[in-house]
């Protein structure tokens, strides 16, 4: 049997890769440039980036989902462990690629104020994992944040929540690291992907095709004319 990560690697070529990553790309872009709630010491970001090459070069490829539970609440603890087991089973069945860390934190750890565990997700299967956790989290809260060299910003203003949010302890997070904190390079996904990358010309052609289709959709907003 072909390993599931090999199957996923074969999906990320050409148009299929473009479509499959669209959800993660849009969420990254929104979180990066139009964060809805800012800490008091931050200011609104500058004008959103529209240069195609710059946007592609800065695209986030890996994410963390942190599932929270009150460590003294037996029902929440059990629900969190059942969700973790379900993710592992579905990964084994090929539903998506998601890698829970071996450790479950039974006490506050790092920035996380309650019991928690981490799930690493590459951009190639972000939409599938996000969908599954939205539908199956029950009453658990889930912190979603990108993995970049700016760990503080990733947790502070680039984060998102599925369910009620928790206050994070950001005091010891580094402002900027020398390297991107990529994980599980053996899977060849996320930042470690070796899949074919579409050229700018291929992307613009695909974009033109999509615009042509959407001209028949009355509710779809029209894109402005492309700069020369």
UniProtKB/Swiss-Prot annotation:
Molecular function as annotated in GO: dioxygenase activity
Major localization class: cytoplasm
Tissue expression: Expressed at high level in coloured cap tissue and at least 10 times lower level in the stipe.
Keywords for this protein: Cytoplasm, Dioxygenase, Oxidoreductase
GO cellular component, one term: cytoplasm
Alphabetized InterPro entries for the sequence: DOPA-like_sf, DOPA_dioxygen
Family matches, as Pfam families: DOPA_dioxygen
Keyword Oxidoreductase attached: yes
The enzyme's E.C. designation: 1.14.99.-
Pathway terms, separated by semicolons: Pigment biosynthesis; betalain biosynthesis
PANTHER family from the UniProt entry: AFR070WP
Quaternary assembly: Homodimer.
Protein name: DOPA 4,5-dioxygenase
Gene: DODA
